[in-house]
Amino acid sequence: MKAVVLTLAVLFLTGSQARHFWQQDDPQSPWDRVKDLVTVYVDAVKDGGREYVAQFEASALGKQLNLKLLDNWDTLGSTITKLREQIGPVTQEFWDNLEKETEVLRQEMSKDLEEVKQKVQPYLDDFQKKWQEEVELYRQKVAPLGTELRE
């Protein structure tokens, strides 16, 4: 009985995080992924730094100096948050402009490649024709040798 319950629990708990094919979530843009990673990193640094500052203030040296670093750390954290909020739209605008410019370049490159393809196509056709003729000549030359070896 325990094995059945354990098996069902593992089955449902691991399957509950699965992504079904009918879910139509839009994929996250690279910029959103970078923003999320930076946010996670900054939050981790803030939390880790807060712990170290609290430990320092609790120590004898911290009590003796009475620097109140924890208050300064909180101020620094709120300043970083405000800065991130102010920089967000500017960086988003930068990435949007970059995407537009790269799209224009991509279209120009596609057009140029199509022109090159059209210019090169006659040469490729001529090469293929000559190649087929050469192969046919070699076949004709080798055919008597093949029949000779079979006999």
Swiss-Prot record:
Glycosylated. Palmitoylated. It comes from Panthera tigris altaica. GO terms for biological process: acylglycerol homeostasis; cholesterol efflux; cholesterol metabolic process; lipoprotein metabolic process; phospholipid efflux; positive regulation of cholesterol efflux; positive regulation of phagocytosis; positive regulation of phospholipid efflux. Keywords: Cholesterol metabolism, Glycoprotein, HDL, Lipid metabolism, Lipid transport, Lipoprotein, Oxidation, Palmitate, Phosphoprotein, Repeat, Secreted, Signal, Steroid metabolism, Sterol metabolism, Transport. This is Apolipoprotein A-I. The keyword Transferase does not apply. Belongs to the apolipoprotein A1/A4/E family. GO terms for cellular component: chylomicron; extracellular vesicle; high-density lipoprotein particle; low-density lipoprotein particle; very-low-density lipoprotein particle. The gene is APOA1.
